[in-house]
Amino acid sequence: MAMIRACLSGVLVLLSVTIAYAEGDPARGERSFSKCSACHIIDNPRTRMGPHLMGVVGRPAGSVADYNYSAAMKDTGAKGMVWTEDNLRAFLYSPKKLVPGTSMRFFGLWSEDEINDLIAYMKTVPAPQ
């Protein structure tokens, strides 16, 4: 009986670790953000080639006031799209597939883990005050 409890405890620990990493690792996501930082800032509400990404998770698409979005992104935001984790995941995988006509010059991230890590990192950054 003790052996069964020990085995079950081990399985539960492994499952909890797997579930935590399925949600992404913010530290790895911060490192992955270097691929985004040529165009985006995440620690300051300024724009570069792209809009800042402070508080992006939960923000309506195309809503950073001082950024000139493509017509496609403005349209997407006007239709009510919000940057949920699922929408971000789809956009990071293939921007032009989710928002045809977007001006984002990025072909997408290659790995589901990298996308999950990046989203986990972006969730840690609050919206500007």
Located regions from the model:
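Short Fe-S-cluster ligation motifs
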Residues: 65-82
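Electrostatic cytochrome c docking/interface patches
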Residues: 16-33, 129
